[in-house]
Every structure is written in C-alpha cells, then in structure tokens.
Amino acid sequence: MKVLVTGATGFVGSKLVDRLVNRGALVTCLIRKGISNSAVKTVTGDLTYPDFIFPDEEYDVVYHLAASWPGEKDKKILRAVNYDGTVNLFSLLKEKTKFIVYVSGLGVFGNPRNNIVDENSPIKPHTEYAKIRLEAQKFLESNCKELGIAFSVAYLGDVYGNGGWFKNILVERLKKGSFRLPGSGEYYRSFVHVDDVVSALESIIEKNAINQSFVVADSTPVTFKDFVNLICKELGVKEPGSIPTILAKAVMGGDFVNLLTTSIKTSNNKITSICDFVYKSYVEGIPATISEMKS
C-alpha cells in the first residue's frame, strides 16, 4: 500500500509514519524540513507556497494532518495553512489518490453544553481556528465527491503521549512549577492517547471506512483539573494553581483558551467498533505515559 502523509514530522504524524512503515506500507512524507526515518520517501515543500511537485505515482490513501497550532494568533497564517494549504494539496493530488483522510479536532462541534458529542452531533464551531478547519473539510468533502475520491474525517480529542504539547508544555511546566490552569479547570475534556489515534487512523483504512466521520477519543471524559492532577500525582509534584481566563488568553491566544476551556464529552462507540484502544481511559494512559517518560 502506498501512503502519503502531510504533517509527518508532528506529534501524531511521526507516530503514524512509524506505524505504517512497520506494517510494510510504502510511505511518502510531505515535509518542510528533515525527517529522521530513512525508510520513507520525502517531498520537501510548503503547502502555503506550492512550488513543488509530487512524484509521478498514485497513493492508495493520503492522510492530511498538516495544520497550524491552535494557539496561532495571526488569522492570516491560520487561513494560509489550514484552508489554503488544503486547497493547494488537493490541487496537487486530485489525480494521484483514491482516498483522503482528513484529521481535524473536536473544536468543530463548538460548545455542546451538556450534550454528548458523537458523529451525528451538530457542527457549530465557535473559534476562528475551528471555523477554518471546518471550511477546509467541506472543501475536501465537496471536491472529493465531485471527482469520485473517497473521503473520511477523524475528529481527534486532546492527544497526549510521550511527546508533543503534552510532554513539552504540560509535563515540563508542571515539573518546573510554572504551569497554571486557565480558569477553574472544571471544564470537561475528551482525551486520547497518541497510540490509539494512530490505531484509529489505521483502522479507517483497513476497514475501508470511506465517506464517514469518526470521533476519536477515549471513553472517559474528565475535567482538565482532574486530568492535570493525575499527571502531578504520577510525577510526584505539587498540583498547580490557576490564572484568570482573560490572562490565559493574553498569553496563549483567545482561540486556544476558548477551545481548551469549552466542556466537551464524547462517545467513541463508532470508532471503537472498528478499533480496539490500548488505553480505554486516561486513568490507564497517564501512568503508562509518565512511566515511559521516566524510563
């Protein structure tokens, strides 16, 4: 199987690439800078400046993970990376692939109040970041349908594991005593371990789950405060204090803080019907992750 991955050097993308290679897939990565995996082909380029070409070959599937960080404050950059980059990618690949899997986030569901979010829930993004991600999704859906290209979308919960924001921002700052909870921390979040995200993305292809959407999160929504406190327990450090939401927005950006502090509880019944999660709950995943970091 030939696979193209965008965002291949990111937290999720790099793990996905490693798994695909181990499964025997022929993987090509679209990157802006070097990649350490010598077992893959690379195409160097920036989707916001598509002055490059892909090899003259077809891909069984394209995983589109490339996106800006939700904390990006410049709206022009948000649009250039998340929407324009997606349009440019499709233009380059529309005759080279049979299936596109778009990787998005739960932010597109906006504020569901007390409702449990699943694949049939209303899509009502309330941040600029999520609105642009949804716009890109709709572009792909429409154009894939027109050209007969299979399309599916994975809405990821907050991804944790040994790397990415979880390690480099949350864990490191908790260890230094410099992390503060935005607001009360009593808002619910739906987390998912990076290994289970990779398994879910694999399963969408293995089960040929075309033209569908999947909520990818574990089965135990938890308040951000309780999630952080469990990390502190495993690290053996003091639980953090909090800062007013308005101050957090000034530091981390309004969109990012709005996404983080909006309560969202999800059902993962659909994705777990085709994929077995290793860490069915953060209660299992956090101790395993912190143990891995210490080893």
Residue ranges of model-derived segments:
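NAD(P)H-binding glycine-rich loop region in Rossmannoid oxidoreductase-like domains
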Residues: T44-D84, L92
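Conserved Rossmann-fold NAD(P)-dependent oxidoreductase catalytic core, especially the SDR/UDP-sugar
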Residues: V87-E128
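NAD(P)-dependent short-chain dehydrogenase/reductase
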Residues: N143-R189, V194
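Glycine/proline-rich active-site loop of Rossmann-fold NAD(P)-dependent oxidoreductases
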Residues: L134, L147-I149, V159-I169, S203-F214, ...
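N-terminal Rossmann NAD(P)H-binding glycine-rich loop of SDR-like oxidoreductase domains
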Residues: V3-R23
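Catalytic helix-loop patch of NAD(P)-dependent Rossmann-fold dehydrogenases
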Residues: A80, N111-V153, D158
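Mid/C-terminal beta-alpha module of Rossmann-like enzyme folds, strongest
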Residues: I204-D255
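Amphipathic terminal alpha-helices
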Residues: S281-S295
